Amino acid sequence: MAQVIDPHSWGVVEPLIPVGGRYLELGAGTGSIAKRAADKVGAAGLAVATDINTKHIQPHEFLNVVTHDLQTDPISDLDPELWNAIRARCLFAHLGKRDTLVAPLADALKPGGHLVIEDWGATGGGFVLRSPYKRTEVLFQQYQAALMAYLRSAGNDGTWIQRAHKLMVEAGLEVTTFTSAKSWNGRSPGCKLPISMSIQIEEHLVEHGMGRDDIYELRDHLNDPDVVLMGNLTWSFVGRKPVEG
């Protein structure tokens, strides 16, 4: 995933992180963006990366790694001071209390600070732009349908992206929302991602209606450079806390 959306994500958040500032990343995954943020704030600042399982977060001399569950642990437990930037990517749609978590994050910002929430959802799924095979489009549609069905069964809310902007405004933030996507040829990161995902959750895809042979056939197609996918839309919600006066 990092290879697919890190360039976009870093382009969004990097201008919002001041040198020597305070940066908090929630659900940091491997910490690929958090490490860049740590470089930006430097020794004079503070960069914190959290997750419920931090074993995949790569170490960095200026990055503090903390085990933290956003649904149960107050943000103030991480540090009582306010933050210049707080970021979460592909996290909120998975959380059961997602709608109630925005306001506390807005409250944890310094005046002029930013909350960045990025996610994928049920709107803006990827699709096949070109393929030398007749079945690629149908197979990819089957994959997307089975994937979304599995995610729903696991508690993921694909409609979250339709509420995020409104919830951030209601939390007192000045919000700008935009999307980003690009095309990917077979064997490139954007095609390797569904291949990897289909391997990780193969049994779940089968349980939700995709034939095993169809999964294998789709993987073969996505390894062909002549196949071109349009990637999922990445939704970026950027909220700024107003400066009083």
Where are the language model's segments positioned?
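Conserved alpha-helix/loop element of class I SAM-dependent methyltransferases that forms part
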Residues: 3-21, 36
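Helix-to-beta-strand junctions that scaffold the AdoMet/dcAdoMet cofactor pocket
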Residues: 18, 42, 95-96, 109-111
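Class I SAM-dependent methyltransferase SAM/SAH-binding core
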Residues: 22-76
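A short acidic, Gly/Pro-enriched loop at the edge of an enzyme's catalytic core
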Residues: 75-86
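Residues lining the SAM
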Residues: 84-92, 118
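A short glycine-rich, Lys/Arg-flanked "PGG" loop and its adjoining helix->strand segment in the class I
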Residues: 99-114
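Conserved catalytic/acceptor-binding region of the Class I
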Residues: 116-188
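Conserved Class I S-adenosyl-L-methionine
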Residues: 157-162, 174-245
